[in-house]
């Protein structure tokens, strides 16, 4: 084709393509019919020549460059409804063969578009984002993104010199999705979406559904395959059940341990090799990871994510993370992920004003802006936003084997007036303060995970008294499996901060939690939030001198492990780190090496033994959420600050927990018990092994048939100072009890016989009575 006559369509598309605002490139570029012939149009701004090749490499036509902007047109001698062709493109320094993206049809099915628009696609991450695939025998990447209000969206990356003119995408008006298949793009390629918004502004955005991201401060998404599904271990998921022991070790991967020589992070492999054996040895059943979805600012600890589907690149690749989780499972340890779906940061490469409109967030800052955190609130009422967030729960459980999600800042999600003054928030449609859309999102997501999650659990960090957090949605609940008990944590830590002499006046701070214990399924949390921002460490919250602080801490942990509810402890607290947590440094492991570890080693040993005892005795966990599993034995001894309660298992076995929160030894302290048997002190926080003063009961404790505290039997104890002791009861064997009962019955019969009067005795008594009566007359 030597000459070319421009049409109005040509002139229009030359302007659209060269000025980079073409919304429908597939209607013009690629193979099209033109009367009795076919034409192929190619737009390559930097090219000097373009030839059309057949599948076997034969030149079918040489394209004519009809505009300096880079538009080439090739005419074929016959009509083709479809054609497997390639491009041979000449540049100033070389000539290379390329596939034409505009010859490939969309792989988005009508059903996908419909489900995505409706917000009911269970797994939109299988469609949206960047997916390695083969189309018509050609390998490449299928890109798709939701941006309904954009004028134009292009894929840009290191494969097209980040030039938004080269690969504009196809728009699906019915769903607002843009897509394109780019041949020969490979795993590891960097990319973003260049978006022209309705105001003519260019926005360079990371992929919301990216499966990998660049290491900060760079912000490009990285092409990688959708992770394969993980086969669920039913036994491990059973370990999430309410009648199982759950002891959670909360970890920030960036500061648990670091390389001493340069203060740099361990990678996922190094973490797996060190963290998992440690957690296993310490007796924890679960690891909870602070957020590991990609985030730009280290100081956010991961709580301001920009890539919910992308594991942070700080510690390695997504496959490395999957290996870490697999190794935890092999060790019998479940993994929980801190899940942040309440807000997102304002970083320009993220979700904020994604297509120029308030797409993921609310437009009105009274609904869409978090004043406390300078973040934006998701618009849960928008179908596509709901779908984006809800399916993320399945992504982590199915593709990484995550066993549970801990949902961050639930209170900020469900209340429209959270941390706002009057006039700073908008009521819901009924005039109330509840965020009905957020509640609907949580209910539907929890219901979906119950159905699809194969036993994965969802835990709420919810700090108010909102009713029904762990109740079923069918009962007007929200459907979480567990809820953090922030009230118990705050009350008990306040109590422990008091000098023992004043604790008697605040006795109820340790007992009040039982008033609402069975309203929800609670986790007792001593989390990262309690050891930052000037709150000091958990050890630092304890009252007294150094010895008393450690004794108080051991006693407090004992009370916590004995109390109903699952356990959570933030890293460093297991060995009583003295300073606040610093996300930018390793924990103070050196404390365990100084002078043999001293008091810190004592606390470490105590926590290890608490965990092991907790798992050994079903009484300490089986009936956490059943009133039949707990009974106060001593609840009102405020003058001596002593507490005692009994934990019971389904089979009736029990463990008694006794705490003394004064530095005074309580000798000969009698506690009523419900059954006779052998009582044994199985744990004592004051033992020398834990660096205590070694006061205790030294083995078996005699049970006596002396009534006390309304019980038929009792035991007499020596309760160490600032301590918690655990006492296991082994009831007398049934045969022994029956034998004793038989002996008692025989004795009673013998006694009755001994006291029963004979006939002779009756006769004598009668005569004496008659004589006395006669004399009286």
Curated annotation (Swiss-Prot):
Which reaction equations make up its catalytic activity? Transfers a segment of a (1->4)-alpha-D-glucan chain to a primary hydroxy group in a similar glucan chain
Transferase listed as a keyword: yes
- Write out the pathway annotation from the protein's UniProt entry: Glycan biosynthesis; glycogen biosynthesis
A single Pfam family it belongs to is Alpha-amylase_C
Task: Provide the GO MF annotations for this entry.
Answer: 1,4-alpha-glucan branching enzyme activity; cation binding; hydrolase activity, hydrolyzing O-glycosyl compounds
Residues of the active site? 408 (nucleophile), 461 (proton donor)
Q: Give the UniProt entry's GO cellular component terms.
A: cytosol
GO annotation (BP), single: glycogen biosynthetic process
UniProt EC number: 2.4.1.18
* EC top class, as a word: transferase
Q: Describe its partners and assembly state.
A: Monomer.
Function noted in UniProt:
Catalyzes the formation of the alpha-1,6-glucosidic linkages in glycogen by scission of a 1,4-alpha-linked oligosaccharide from growing alpha-1,4-glucan chains and the subsequent attachment of the oligosaccharide to the alpha-1,6 position.
Question: What family name appears in the similarity comment?
Answer: Belongs to the glycosyl hydrolase 13 family. GlgB subfamily.
- What is the protein name stated in its UniProt record? 1,4-alpha-glucan branching enzyme GlgB
In which organism is this protein found?
A: Actinobacillus pleuropneumoniae serotype 7 (strain AP76)
């Amino acid at each position: 084709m030597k000459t070319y006559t421009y049409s109005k369509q040509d002139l229009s598309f030359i302007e659209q393509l060269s000025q980079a605002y073409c919304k429908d490139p597939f209607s013009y570029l690629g193979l099209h019919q033109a009367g009795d012939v076919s034409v192929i149009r190619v737009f390559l701004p930097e090219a000097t020549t373009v030839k059309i090749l057949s599948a076997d490499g034969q030149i079918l036509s040489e394209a004519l460059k009809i505009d300096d902007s880079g538009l080439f047109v090739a005419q074929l001698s016959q009509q083709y409804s479809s054609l497997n062709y390639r491009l041979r493109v000449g540049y100033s320094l070389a000539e290379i063969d390329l596939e034409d993206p505009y010859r490939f049809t969309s792989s988005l099915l009508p059903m996908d578009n419909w489900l995505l628009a409706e917000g009911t696609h269970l797994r939109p991450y299988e469609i949206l984002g960047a997916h390695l695939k083969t189309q018509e025998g050609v390998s490449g990447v299928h890109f798709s993104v939701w941006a309904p209000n954009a004028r134009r969206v292009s894929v840009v990356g290191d494969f097209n010199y980040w030039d938004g003119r080269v690969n504009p995408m196809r728009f699906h008006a019915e769903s607002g999705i843009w897509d394109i298949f780019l041949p020969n793009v490979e795993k590891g390629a960097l990319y973003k979406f260049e978006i022209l918004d309705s105001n003519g502004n260019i926005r360079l955005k990371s992929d919301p559904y990216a499966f990998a991201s660049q290491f900060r401060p760079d912000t490009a998404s990285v092409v990688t395959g959708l992770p394969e599904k993980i086969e669920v271990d039913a036994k491990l998921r059973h370990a999430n059940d309410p009648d199982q022991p759950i002891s959670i070790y909360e970890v920030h991967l960036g500061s648990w341990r670091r390389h001493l020589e340069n203060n740099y992070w361990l990678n996922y492999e190094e973490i797996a090799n060190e963290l998992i054996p440690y957690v296993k040895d310490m007796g924890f059943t679960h690891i909870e990871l602070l957020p590991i979805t990609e985030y730009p600012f280290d100081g956010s600890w991961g709580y301001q994510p920009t890539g919910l589907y992308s594991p942070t690149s700080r510690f390695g690749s997504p496959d490395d993370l999957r290996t870490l989780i697999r190794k935890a499972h092999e060790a019998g340890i479940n993994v929980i992920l801190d899940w942040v779906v309440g807000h997102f940061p304002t970083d320009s490469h993220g979700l904020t004003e994604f297509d120029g409109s308030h797409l993921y967030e609310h437009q009105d800052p009274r609904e869409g802006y978090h004043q406390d955190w300078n973040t934006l609130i998701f618009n849960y009422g928008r179908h596509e936003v709901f779908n984006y967030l809800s399916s993320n729960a399945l992504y982590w459980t199915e593709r990484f084997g995550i066993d549970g999600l801990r949902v961050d800042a639930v209170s900020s999600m469900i209340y429209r007036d959270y941390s706002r003054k009057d006039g700073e928030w908008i009521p819901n449609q009924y005039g109330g303060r509840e965020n009905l859309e957020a509640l609907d999102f949580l209910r539907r997501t929890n219901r979906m995970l119950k159905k699809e999650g194969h036993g994965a659990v969802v835990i709420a960090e919810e700090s108010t008294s909102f009713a029904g957090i762990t109740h079923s949605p069918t009962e007007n609940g929200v459907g979480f499996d567990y809820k953090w008990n922030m009230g118990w944590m705050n009350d008990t830590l306040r109590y422990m901060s008091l000098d023992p002499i004043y604790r008697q006046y605040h006795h109820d701070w340790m007992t009040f939690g039982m008033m609402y214990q069975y309203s929800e399924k609670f986790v007792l949390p001593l989390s990262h939030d309690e050891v930052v921002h000037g709150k000091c460490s958990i050890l630092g919250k304890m009252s007294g001198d150094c010895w008393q602080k450690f004794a108080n801490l051991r006693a407090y942990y004992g009370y916590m492990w004995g109390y109903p509810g699952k356990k959570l402890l933030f890293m460093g607290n297991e060995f009583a780190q003295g300073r606040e947590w610093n996300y930018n440094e390793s924990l103070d492991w050196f404390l365990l090496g100084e002078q043999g570890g001293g008091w810190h080693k004592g606390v470490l040993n105590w926590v290890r033994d608490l965990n092991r005892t907790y798992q050994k005795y079903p009484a300490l966990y089986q009936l956490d959420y059943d009133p039949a599993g707990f009974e106060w034995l001593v609840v009102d001894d405020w003058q001596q600050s002593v507490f005692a309660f009994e934990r019971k298992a389904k089979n009736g076995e029990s463990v008694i927990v006794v705490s003394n929160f004064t530095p005074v030894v309580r000798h000969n302290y009698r506690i009523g018990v419900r059954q006779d048997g052998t009582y044994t002190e199985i744990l004592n926080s004051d033992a020398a092994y834990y660096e205590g003063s070694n006061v205790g009961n030294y083995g078996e404790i005699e049970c006596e048939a002396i009534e006390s505290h309304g019980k038929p039997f009792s035991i007499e104890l020596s309760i160490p100072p600032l301590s918690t002791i655990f006492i296991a009861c082994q009831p007398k064997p049934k045969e022994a009890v029956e034998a004793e009962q038989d002996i008692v019955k025989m004795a009673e019969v013998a006694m009755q016989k001994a006291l029963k009067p004979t006939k002779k005795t009756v006769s004598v008594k009668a005569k004496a009575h008659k004589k006395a009566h006669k004399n009286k007359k």
